[in-house]
């Protein structure tokens, strides 16, 4: 109530690279779309970079620990990455939870930022078209969404399709 402008307008007035990105984004994170930057950030200081309200992994790979994803779990249910079998995500092959498959590992789990751009992305479901740097290379990601699943093409790998109702077999 003491701000000189609406929160989102005020924040994006300085963070113009984020503003440019979300202006052309096909999908936007709900707090960004609603101009609620403080849902994730504390502009007056925070223990987590970059001014985050809670922990969020900074690296490409990380062992899965529930506390490391405290920022995400402030809004999203933990079951998105903890349950191997669930219907709570659209990213599943049958009932096999593909978020859990990629993230929930004791050593080299991929972090959310590998596939998702937290402010906005040029593909559906906040999926980025280039993963953050993996060494000197940014990995291209191409997501093709269907009504019941989709196909993901990552880097040099063959396409992987998934379907919630008619699971794709990879045996």
Question: Where would I find each of the regions flagged by the language model?
Answer:
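Inter-heme linker and motif-flanking segments adjacent to c-type heme-binding CXXCH motifs
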Residues: 1-171
């Amino acid at each position: 109530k003491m701000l000189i402008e609406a929160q989102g307008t005020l924040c994006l007035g300085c963070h113009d690279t984020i503003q440019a990105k979300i202006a052309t984004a096909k999908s936007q994170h709900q707090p960004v779309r609603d101009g609620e930057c403080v849902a994730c950030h504390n502009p007056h200081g925070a223990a987590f970079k970059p001014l985050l309200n809670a922990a969020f992994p900074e690296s490409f790979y990380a062992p899965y620990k529930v506390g490391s994803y405290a920022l995400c779990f402030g809004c999203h249910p933990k079951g998105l990455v903890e349950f191997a079998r669930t219907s709570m995500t659209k990213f599943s092959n049958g009932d096999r939870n593909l978020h859990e498959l990629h993230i929930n590992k004791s050593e080299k789990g991929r972090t959310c930022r590998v596939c998702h751009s937290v402010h906005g992305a040029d593909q559906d479901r906040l999926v980025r078209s280039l993963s953050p740097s993996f060494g000197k290379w940014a990995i291209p990601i191409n997501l093709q969404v269907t009504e019941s699943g989709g196909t993901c093409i990552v880097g040099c790998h063959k396409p992987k399709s998934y379907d919630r109702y008619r699971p794709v077999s990879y045996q």
